[in-house]
């Protein structure tokens, strides 16, 4: 099966990522996937308005594709709850930061198809950038369906799972870097005498325009940057200051720090999960 039409999609966790995915898929005109949502409280909220809510157990039995959108520290407990209710052919699609496909496969049993996805909060506006990696038992058909579903909320590409920690350093949190640039440059514009709203609006449009120019032209960002620069002009003067303050090195270090922290969080999540499982096993009543 390579088309999501008629597919049962159950989203476990209705936070910003989960609810945005559910709405995007449910409202897509391309296919008529059946979308259900579970929440921790079981109660509807503004984020789940217009969506069908079910219990975790009910959702597990009805899912062709189970989207796991929980916090890392809550994921092990959810899987323990739904593991026995999932059908053998249900594909588990994880949006959980730091947890690998191997971690899910070990928790859910041999042969379970698992797909791991990194995305961005821009999926709220249908502008997300998602990267999907298949586990040991995910087939090309599984990946095709997942990518089709993800295109309802932005773009989606496949990549080896080894790339995903690095992806999180430039894409997962990458939009925050652009927010920071707009924030600081707005302050700089105000310092130079511009009204704050005007400075911010101009910079937002500059960011949108730059993104569209890179996408539409296919040219290297350095080439596009050089198009803006004129000999002895304002932009060259600005970039001399950026180089003097080693902004390039700071960005390299920021991405490296995010990558390293992602690996630390993944290791800690796996350790916490093993400790929790060990404690539960020790506290289990004898049969």
Language-model regions, residue ranges each:
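NAD(P)+-binding Rossmann beta1-loop-alpha1 motif at the extreme N-terminus of oxidoreductases
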Residues: 1-57, 61, 65, 190-192, ...
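NAD(P)-dependent Rossmann-like dehydrogenase/reductase catalytic/cofactor-binding core
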Residues: 2-5, 204-287
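Rossmann-like NAD(P)(H) cofactor-binding subdomain of soluble oxidoreductases
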Residues: 21-23, 36, 42-45, 49, ...
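Glycine-rich beta-alpha junction loops
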Residues: 39-42, 96-99, 119-123, 171, ...
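Internal alpha-helical scaffold of NAD(P)-dependent oxidoreductase catalytic cores
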Residues: 103-113, 129-167, 177-216, 261
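Catalytic, metal-anchored helix/loop core of enzyme active sites in primary metabolism
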Residues: 170, 182, 285
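Aromatic-residue-lined binding/catalytic grooves and analogous aromatic/hydrophobic interfacial grooves
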Residues: 174
């Amino acid at each position: 099966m390579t088309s999501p039409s008629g597919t049962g999609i159950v989203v476990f966790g209705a936070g910003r990522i989960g609810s945005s995915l559910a709405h995007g898929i449910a409202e897509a005109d391309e296919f008529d996937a059946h979308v259900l949502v579970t929440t921790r409280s079981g109660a509807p909220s503004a984020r789940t308005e217009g969506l069908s809510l079910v219990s975790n157990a009910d959702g597990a039995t009805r899912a062709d594709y189970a989207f796991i959108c929980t916090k890392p520290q809550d994921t092990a407990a959810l899987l323990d709850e739904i593991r026995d209710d999932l059908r053998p052919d249900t594909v588990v699609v994880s949006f959980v930061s730091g947890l690998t496909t191997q971690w899910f496969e070990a928790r859910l049993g041999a042969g379970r198809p698992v797909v791991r996805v990194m995305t961005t909060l821009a999926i709220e506006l249908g502008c997300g950038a998602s990267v999907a990696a298949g586990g040991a038992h995910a087939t090309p058909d599984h990946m095709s369906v997942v990518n089709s579903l993800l295109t309802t909320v932005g773009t989606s590409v496949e990549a080896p799972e080894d790339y995903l920690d690095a992806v999180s350093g430039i894409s997962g949190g990458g939009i925050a870097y652009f927010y920071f640039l707009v924030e600081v440059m707005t302050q700089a514009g105000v310092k130079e005498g511009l009204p704050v709203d005007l400075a911010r609006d101009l910079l937002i449009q500059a960011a949108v325009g730059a993104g569209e120019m890179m996408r539409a032209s296919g040219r290297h960002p350095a080439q596009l940057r050089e198009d803006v620069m004129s000999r002895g002009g304002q932009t060259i003067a600005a970039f001399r200051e950026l180089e003097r303050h080693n902004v390039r090195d700071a960005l390299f270090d920021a991405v490296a720090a995010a990558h390293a922290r992602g690996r630390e969080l993944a290791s800690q999540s796996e350790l916490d999960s093993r400790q929790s499982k060990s404690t539960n096993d020790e506290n289990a009543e004898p049969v």
